[in-house]
Amino acid sequence: MREDIRKIVLIVLEVILAPFVFISAIILKIFRKLGPRRLPKNTKLLKIIGIYPLRDHYYEPQFKYDTFDEDASKNRVLCGLDLRPDHQIRLLNEMNYQDDFENFLSDQNKKESDLAFNFDNGMINTGDAEFLYNYIRHLKPSKVIEIGCGSSTKIISSALRTNNKNSEHICIEPYEQKWLEKMSDIKVYRTPLEKVKSDVFDILEENDLLFIDSSHIIRPQGDVLKEYLEIIPALSKGVHIHVHDIFTPNDYPKSWLDEHMLFWNEQYILEALLTNTNTYEIVAALNFLKNNYYSEFKK
């Protein structure tokens, strides 16, 4: 009933807003035609409000995907990128902690609501969650650093405790998840990654884990560039890196780009880093496994 009311409200809002959006779009198109330098006060006003119009132009981020290939199972041609499928399947067969993960799920009703993990979290869903838990159990890291935290933090924290090692868990989360401070077994940095000193990552050693789930967007002097050009190249040999929301060898899902209007591009700098390299190797590409080796992945 509540969902039906919500749908009706959204339909009414669409009808009411449509003429205003149309008129605003015409005005903003004129603004972009004249250019922000010619209209500095209007440009400043848009920055204060926190919104800026994009044009359908080859110099700007893409937001129209009329010709986008929707075949999610179609692998892109990525010359020089070794996905190592045999190694990935071997890893899946070696990880056998699903019973412990089920115990982790059953324990969630004993926790405060904001500290409990559930699959209806909008961040890390089935498949990703099971793999992350199993991988932490399998890897048994002494130290984990998360860049971007949330439901993954709950999974990692539980897996580390079950490993029964004196592990260190550091979370870098400047924007969200106010409940992090309630978790006594983690150290929280409430600082944008761009301002975190890179020597924080010097503690990571062989078989430790760096988990990345940050802005997903390449920006000048932004977090993604710091991760891939400053932090990752300086890591000690044998450190494992888990990057969330990667769909290699496919593109990002069309619904994410066309419906949710996400401008994410992190995946492509990661693919460039992994192309024709002996420095890094792919351990697991979950979207690839799901689309090409589903029976092995499902186990």
Please place each PLM-identified region on the residue numbering.
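A short alpha-helical cap/connector motif
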Residues: 2-162, 166-242, 246-299
